[in-house]
Amino acid sequence: MLFPTEFDVIVVGGGHAGTEAALASARMGAKTLLLTHNIETLGQMSCNPSIGGIGKGHLVKEVDALGGAMAAATDESGIQFRILNSSKGPAVRATRAQADRILYKAAIRHRLENQPNLWLFQQAVDDLMVEGDRVVGAVTQIGIRFRARAVVLTAGTFLDGKIHVGLNNYTGGRAGDPAAVSLSARLKELKLPQGRLKTGTPPRIDGRSIDFSKLDEQPGDLDPIPVFSFLGRAEQHPQQLPCWVTHTNERTHDIIRGGLDRSPMYTGVIEGVGPRYCPSIEDKIHRFASKESHQIFLEPEGLTTNEFYPNGISTSLPFDVQLELVHSMRGLENAHILRPGYAIEYDYFDPRALKASLETKAINGLFFAGQINGTTGYEEAAAQGLLAGLNAGRYVQEKDAWCPRRDQAYLGVLVDDLVTRGVAEPYRMFTSRAEYRLSLREDNADMRLTEIGRELGLVDDARWDAFSRKRDAVSRETERLKSTWVTPKTLPPKEATALLGKAIDHEYSLAELLRRPGISYDGVCSLKGGECAPAEPLADDPVLLEQIKEQVEIGIKYQGYIERQASEIERNDANENTRLPDGIDYREVRGLSFEVSQKLNEFRPETIGQASRISGVTPAAISLLMVHLKRRGLGRRNGAAAEATEQGDGTVPTQQ
């Protein structure tokens, strides 16, 4: 058998973006090759050992709803699960899990090795094969030429990566891995707009040298234990472990200030911009000089290691300063550092040069996903990877690209922000970035996306069957609550007072009672001695049962707000999705200022909605664009009719 070198899709990179891209492309039926410099690091958690969080957990749930791997792998490797913002409204509740690094990698690799249509090969990529304006393949470090109609590039921090510890620096993609210098140089030859960003990681600590008696324990949620995947079960989780909390102090801060003269960030050695929402400890001390203390979370890296990740002290200070600052904190006085913290600078490419499909505008068939687009975080990378892999598969199948709208998914918000606004610093997802977050909750990610995923070919039969049962049960139970009534005669005053605070004075549906503050689904079902409960169990599986009850309760309690948001979405929909012609020259649009026409010509938005979110493009400019499109459409129709009349056939071609 000859060694295969012809594929439909090539994915370069085996991190969180690359693995989801390869799996999505292969699920689409495309013959897919995943190229990685080291098969042992597939799915590696390069920085913190956690998945999810505010906004990020929403992305993980959406990836799961579309058949992706991250949530399921976390359920198999998570050693602590928590629901953040559990006391707040459902829009901002988010799941977060600590993961065992080794188990997580194993779960991802198992899925890759057992995915039909997917080949793995260990080789770094040094070059892309480009013919004219389209990519046709990739060339590896030892000169193997793989051909494909689409290439998804997910290079993470490896593109011309430079690692900094104090004033010492060296090339690297992350600690222990080489940088992709040749590939970075090749991309620069393609004249794609690029820049430099920076991220960092803290020193790792040997747990045997930590005095836990001086620390505050932070356990996970135990009743119930959360799961990430809609198909997940708490029984899949390995042993659960606590995290621990310590704090910086004035001595810590003095040590850090004393080392700033050897900090690559504060001596101008690092030029790349770092993440605003995950700053280094030296940045925190500088920016929040009046703050006396910062909370530091000591997170276990896994069940088979003593290594701990001190979340909150990412740093590129010299190692002697790192050692001193760690020892200044309570419980860490004798801590042994296993690995030094460091910062890494790397190339990224302006995401405004991408289509919403994550295909580059300049080179057909070339897709970017993950940190190469200026984002930070495993979850943002995984979401982009799935979308890029899906659209690479659709590209080779000559199908239209797909991207969710802003009102449809956090993934839609993420991509729209990237391709219309670009990034000045590493982009992190928050719930505050979404205008319609009440409709984009974690709990309904499957309701929003799984049917679409099924149509796209991403969702398998097992997921579809489970989703269909849940969807139908939610619908039936919602209708039952709306059509089941209690009256002052049928609901004893004592029972009504116990649940509602007073007896009822007229007829109510169970749905109306559930809308009252402080009333739960279980409470309503307990009325009349349990007669208000459904006649048959909503589901046999306890996890699915809780999901159904949650969906029903939120849907009824927030019905008015959700309907109001849906009306707002409908009003905005017409302009949002109006497409702009590919070849339009905005200098010819009557009334547009020079600045606006210049920005529109530079960024080439695909829709009116995207154009409206470009900085400096005013509502008045959007109105002028709409007028121009109407005039242009009328002119094309008139021109086509006149041409048809001259030809004597009396037909008018349909305008696309």
Curated annotation (Swiss-Prot):
InterPro entries: FAD/NAD-bd_sf (IPR036188), GIDA_C_N (IPR049312), MnmG (IPR004416), MnmG-rel (IPR002218), MnmG-rel_CS (IPR020595), MnmG_C (IPR026904), MnmG_C_subdom (IPR047001), MnmG_C_subdom_sf (IPR044920)
Binding positions for FAD per the UniProt entry: G13, G14, G15, H16, A17, G18
Record-listed NAD(+) binding positions: 274-288
Region annotation (Disordered) ranges: 637-656
SMART domains: GIDA_assoc_3
UniProt GO cellular component terms: cytosol
Alphabetical GO biological process terms: tRNA methylation; tRNA wobble uridine modification
Cofactors that this protein relies on: FAD
One Pfam family per UniProt: GIDA_C_1st
Entry keyword NAD: yes
Keyword terms: Cytoplasm, FAD, Flavoprotein, NAD, tRNA processing
HAMAP family, per database record: MnmG_GidA
Family listed: Belongs to the MnmG family.
Functional summary from the UniProt entry: NAD-binding protein involved in the addition of a carboxymethylaminomethyl (cmnm) group at the wobble position (U34) of certain tRNAs, forming tRNA-cmnm(5)s(2)U34.
Subunit description: Homodimer. Heterotetramer of two MnmE and two MnmG subunits.
PANTHER family in UniProt: GLUCOSE INHIBITED DIVISION PROTEIN A, PROTEIN MTO1 HOMOLOG, MITOCHONDRIAL
Protein name: tRNA uridine 5-carboxymethylaminomethyl modification enzyme MnmG
Organism: Burkholderia ambifaria (strain MC40-6)
Lineage: Bacteria, Pseudomonadati, Pseudomonadota, Betaproteobacteria, Burkholderiales
